[in-house]
Amino acid sequence: MEGSLELSSEAILRFLAERGGRAGHSELVQHFRDVLGGQREQRTRARERFKELVNAVATVRTDPADGTKYVHLKKRFCTGDSPPLEAKLPREPPRIEVTEEPQVPDLAAEPCEGSQLQEANPQLSLGLGGEVSDQEPPAPAQGGAQGKDSPPQEVEAVSWASGPGSSENLKLPPQGEAEGGSSPSGPNTPRSARQNFRDLVLGSSPQLKRSVGPGDGNAGGRSRGGGDSDTASLASSSAEEESSVGASVTLDPLDHAWMLSASEGKWDSLEGLLTCEPGLLSKRDFITGFTCLHWAAKHGRQELLAMLVNFATKHQLPVNINAKSSGGYTALHLAAMHGHVEVVKLLVGAYDADVDIRDYSGRKASQYLSESIAEEIKNLVGALDEDDGDSPAARGGGRWRLSKVLPSHITHKLSPVVEDGAELHHHVPEGWTGGSKAKDSGRKASGSSSGRMKPRLNKIRFRTQIIHTTPSFRDAKPTLEEGEEEEEEEEERSLRGYSSSFKLRPKSNVFG
């Protein structure tokens, strides 16, 4: 046998087929040692020829366990498990399919336990002169032989360039098909190359997983083994993101046009929109909370403000001149901020805007007026009243107002009203000493200055004489008559809850 051994692809195929499509590298070299010998140049050419033949029909892989090299027969030259070559040669010529489109190589690795030599077809010629550039699948698994009733498998033959864009595929019917005449289909049926390529792309791109329909995603999940949960979670998360993005509120075109026209203060466009939808007059800006009145006051356009109010009056629409924005500002606040005096006059004088409304920072419109504003404007807005309230007399440097000194439930004990500047002679009990005499001189001096305290007809200050009782002041021990003891007890009961407020109050020229 060794004498007739020749170095050819048929011999290598036969050797690998007899050993189940897999043999050790050293065993293969040892088998063809006789034809690889000779002179140096002859031996070199023989080795190169041997490498080309082996690469054409098989691949060399290294076992990661022990590092041993094995030669595996290529998938196109083997089927599931077959008897030796002589017993398995087909009696009938195989069917050949010629397709114009090149076939995508099958990406799923098929087990290769046996082999079947395809040299019976005279039309199929093996070109073994060049190297094979096809990428081979990973090493096949070693296992038991398959049964005779195994499903049909498609064997792909080597494609040669017999013509542009043409390829030849060799199909060999298995033994079960020849006997039964039918090809059963089962879960072990090889998958199409298109489906394998699709699964590979989907496995490497999670974005494509999300776009796959429910039916398509199941097939890909089965091939990956347990990837259905990951795909479902990715699909649910992407659905939540899309729903959150799509749930953003879209502004109505009419509201959008109204917001732009109101912010620009154009009456021509505002009139047309109001005619179409009168309810826009009280429409608030969803960002600042401004109405068209706020925008007109902010821009200082008193004519636009008057037109808007006249339109509301003409069409009997409710309009609130004191409406607040998101920051609590009224139209009067905005006009005072930007120093629009004419708008302030129109709002307060013509439309009776409330000057005592405070914004959310606690400030009135008069507190936004600049120092350069005329006195009559400040008086119109109420700034002079604020200055009078902040004067030293109001802060406690002068005479006190009764509303700030005494509770309201004891005002029935007040004496008759007197004019400002009148001197009151108070009866001070004998033996009474004030708590802070050092401040009396300063308080009296401030009260004696007539220039600082001017009488106002609309604000009359009430003066009275406070009766200092003995129990209210611990350090006061006056000698009282027996007839006044009952009155003192009544005063004590009425002022018992307020003794702490009177205990430390200093004497003044008003109360003694």
Curated annotation (Swiss-Prot):
Keyword Repeat set for record: yes
Phosphoserine: modified positions: 82, 125, 205
Pfam families cross-referenced by the UniProt entry: Ank_2 (PF12796)
Sequence ranges of the ANK repeats: 288-317, 327-357
UniProt KW keywords: ANK repeat, Methylation, Phosphoprotein, Repeat
Record's compositionally biased regions (Gly residues): 214-228
SUPFAM superfamilies: Ankyrin repeat
InterPro entries: Ankyrin_rpt (IPR002110), Ankyrin_rpt-contain_sf (IPR036770)
Ranges for region Disordered: 126-248, 427-500
Domain of life: Eukaryota
Modification type Omega-N-methylarginine: residues: 395
UniProt keyword annotation of Phosphoprotein present: yes
Family: Belongs to the SOWAH family.
Protein name, per record: Ankyrin repeat domain-containing protein SOWAHC
Source taxonomy: Eukaryota, Metazoa, Chordata, Craniata, Vertebrata
